[in-house]
Amino acid sequence: MVVLKGVPALLSPELLFALARMGHGDEIVLADVNFPSSSICRGGPEEIRADGLGIPQLLEAVLQLLPLDTYVQSPAMVMELVPSDRKSGLLTPVWTSYQSILSRAGYEFSLGMGRFAFYERAKKAFAVVATGETALYGNLILKKGVLAPKDLC
């Protein structure tokens, strides 16, 4: 836990350090409990543990500090349902939460990345945050944007 003015207390020092080191276009994965975080991070992105935290609450905290990329169509991406889950009508209410949180922060939200494409993209991410999110298809990739000089302290 971090106890600093203006910094959400649920953001760990490791996560804050990763967010600070990311550059424009770098991506971070907020991963649910079923995501193969350790496997994806073997030889690739940094793995950051955030066990016990849900992705919606973590997303709200991260967006207080991390600007998302406004130069791309969607700086936030989820994994599409696999055909069998789509056919069975599996619901993904967590996506509605993401959409609401991102919209309040002024960002667009995109669906449309297949499972294996998502895994390959995650391997190229700056970091993967392994959370306690239990919602199916809860994984979310965020692309860092830029801060204008007037927004820098």
Swiss-Prot record:
Pathway: Carbohydrate metabolism; L-fucose metabolism. It comes from Bos taurus (Bovine). One of its GO terms (biological process) is fucose metabolic process. Involved in the interconversion between alpha- and beta-L-fucoses. L-Fucose (6-deoxy-L-galactose) exists as alpha-L-fucose (29.5%) and beta-L-fucose (70.5%), the beta-form is metabolized through the salvage pathway. GDP-L-fucose formed either by the de novo or salvage pathways is transported into the endoplasmic reticulum, where it serves as a substrate for N- and O-glycosylations by fucosyltransferases. Fucosylated structures expressed on cell surfaces or secreted in biological fluids are believed to play a critical role in cell-cell adhesion and recognition processes. Mainly homodimer, but also exists as homotetramer, homooctamer, and homodecamer. The homodimeric form seems catalytically inactive. GO terms for molecular function: fucose binding; L-fucose mutarotase activity; racemase and epimerase activity, acting on carbohydrates and derivatives. Substrate binds at D32, M79, Y119, Y137, N139. Keywords: Isomerase. Its EC number is 5.1.3.29. InterPro entries: RbsD-like_sf, RbsD/FucU_mutarotase, RbsD_FucU. This is Fucose mutarotase. The active site is at H24, D69, Y119. Pfam families: RbsD_FucU. Gene3D superfamilies: RbsD-like domain. Belongs to the RbsD / FucU family. It is an enzyme of class 5 (isomerase). It catalyses: alpha-L-fucose = beta-L-fucose.
